[in-house]
């Protein structure tokens, strides 16, 4: 299965609403546009990989922050509290288990239980 990432991102208009682009071996490749702040949360059983396709964002942890630039990725281990923050629009590709809830242990107005495909 071949996927044109730029074409997929052109169909995404909302921030903080991940879409499924592909699935493999119980994992999902998700695409999301970020802008502004998310919420501190953690995932009890899942690690998350965030790859910056366009732009950059800051991953805030309780004890430090990391800037992730275009072409870079960061892996957030399960159980680690984190909060993505994007001052400008940022396109990210997420690779994580299909069971991963976008807000982890927090349920709020940004929680999306059923993801759409793009």
Task: Locate predicted features.
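Short, charged/polar surface micro-motifs in flexible loops or helix N-caps
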Residues: 26-28, 35-37, 54-58, 65, ...
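A short, N-terminal "cap"/entry segment at the start of jelly-roll beta-barrel domains
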Residues: 1-30, 107-118
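Short acidic-glycine-tyrosine-enriched beta hairpin
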Residues: 62-78
């Amino acid at each position: 299965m071949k996927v044109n990432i730029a074409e997929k991102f052109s169909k995404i208009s909302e921030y903080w609403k991940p879409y499924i682009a592909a699935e493999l071996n119980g994992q999902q490749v998700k695409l999301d546009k970020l802008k502004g702040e998310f919420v501190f949360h953690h995932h009890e059983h899942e690690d998350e990989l965030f790859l910056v396709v366009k732009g950059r964002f800051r991953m805030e942890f309780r004890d430090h922050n990391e800037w992730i630039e275009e072409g870079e990725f960061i892996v957030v281990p399960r159980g680690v509290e984190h909060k993505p923050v994007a001052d400008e629009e940022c396109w990210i590709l997420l690779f994580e288990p299909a069971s991963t809830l976008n807000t982890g242990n927090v349920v709020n107005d940004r929680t999306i239980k059923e993801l759409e495909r793009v």
